[in-house]
C-alpha cells in the first residue's frame, strides 16, 4: 500500500477529527483528485511540440494525458477553434497518492529557492492550485532529452468545505506552507 494513503488513514484522519470535531465519518475532508495541466502555447506554430509535452506529462503522471483544444478563435494569437493548445491529466485513487508522494518528497525539494506555498493559493472552496515552472524537477524527466523547459499547473481538489480544513489536510501530507 502507498505510504501517503496509509498516512492519511492512520494519522491525518485522527488529527482532523480532533481539530474540527467532525461527528460523521463522511464529513472528514479527503483529496478527491489531482489535475495536472500543461499549456503549450508554441503548439500554435509547431504542432509537433504537443507530442513532446504529452510524453513529458505521461512520464510525470504515469497515465496518458488528453489533449486540450482551443474553445474559440483569437486572431491576435493566430489561434483557431479546436487547435491543440495543451494537455492535462486527472489522477485519482492510488496514482493520485503516488504522485503527491513524489511531488512532496522528490520534486519540491529540487525547486530552486522554494520556501513553501502561500495560503492565498486556495480558492475558497478547499481546492489548492499552484504552478511549477520546470518539468525537470521530476526525476522521470531526462534533462538531455527534453526540447524545452515547460511549466505546469497542479490543482489538488479536496472534499473540504473551507480553506482552513483543506490547509490542515494538506499540511498533514507535509506540503510546505508559509505565512
Curated annotation (Swiss-Prot):
| Quaternary organization | Part of the 50S ribosomal subunit; part of the 5S rRNA/L5/L18/L25 subcomplex. Contacts the 5S rRNA and the P site tRNA. Forms a bridge to the 30S subunit in the 70S ribosome.
Q: Name one GO molecular function term.
A: structural constituent of ribosome
* Biological processes annotated in GO: translation
- So what does this one do? This is one of the proteins that bind and probably mediate the attachment of the 5S RNA into the large ribosomal subunit, where it forms part of the central protuberance. In the 70S ribosome it contacts protein S13 of the 30S subunit (bridge B1b), connecting the 2 subunits; this bridge is implicated in subunit movement. Contacts the P site tRNA; the 5S rRNA and some of its associated proteins might help stabilize positioning of ribosome-bound tRNAs.
Q: Which SUPFAM superfamilies match?
A: RL5-like (SSF55282)
Task: Give TM regions.
Answer: none
Q: Which InterPro entries match?
A: Ribosomal_uL5, Ribosomal_uL5_bac-type, Ribosomal_uL5_C, Ribosomal_uL5_CS, Ribosomal_uL5_dom_sf, Ribosomal_uL5_N
User: What is the designated name of this protein?
Assistant: Large ribosomal subunit protein uL5
**Where does the source fall among the domains of life?**
Bacteria
The UniProt keyword set, sorted, is: Ribonucleoprotein, Ribosomal protein, RNA-binding, rRNA-binding, tRNA-binding
Q: Which Gene3D superfamilies match?
A: 3.30.1440.10
Record-stated family: Belongs to the universal ribosomal protein uL5 family.
Q: Does Manganese count among this protein's keywords?
A: no
What's one Pfam family here? Answer: Ribosomal_L5
* One GO CC annotation: ribonucleoprotein complex
Which PROSITE patterns does the UniProt entry name for this protein? Answer: RIBOSOMAL_L5
Is the keyword Ribonucleoprotein assigned to this protein?
yes
Amino acid at each position: 500500500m502507498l505510504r501517503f494513503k496509509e498516512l492519511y488513514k492512520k494519522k491525518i484522519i485522527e488529527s482532523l477529527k480532533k481539530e474540527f470535531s467532525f461527528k460523521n465519518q463522511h464529513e472528514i475532508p479527503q483529496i478527491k483528485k489531482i489535475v495536472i495541466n500543461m499549456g503549450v502555447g508554441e503548439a500554435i506554430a509547431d504542432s509537433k511540440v504537443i507530442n513532446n509535452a504529452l510524453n513529458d506529462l505521461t512520464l510525470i503522471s504515469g497515465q496518458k494525458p488528453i489533449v486540450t483544444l482551443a474553445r474559440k478563435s483569437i486572431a491576435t494569437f493566430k489561434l483557431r477553434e479546436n487547435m491543440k493548445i495543451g494537455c492535462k491529466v486527472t489522477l485519482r485513487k492510488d496514482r493520485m497518492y503516488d504522485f503527491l508522494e513524489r511531488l512532496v518528497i522528490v520534486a519540491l525539494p529540487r525547486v530552486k529557492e522554494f520556501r513553501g506555498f502561500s495560503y492565498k493559493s486556495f480558492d475558497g472552496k478547499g481546492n489548492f492550485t499552484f504552478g511549477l515552472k520546470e518539468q525537470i524537477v521530476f526525476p522521470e524527466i531526462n534533462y538531455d532529452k527534453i526540447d524545452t523547459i515547460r511549466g505546469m499547473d497542479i490543482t489538488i481538489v479536496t472534499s473540504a468545505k473551507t480553506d482552513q480544513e483543506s490547509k490542515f489536510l494538506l499540511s498533514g501530507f507535509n506540503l510546505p506552507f508559509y505565512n
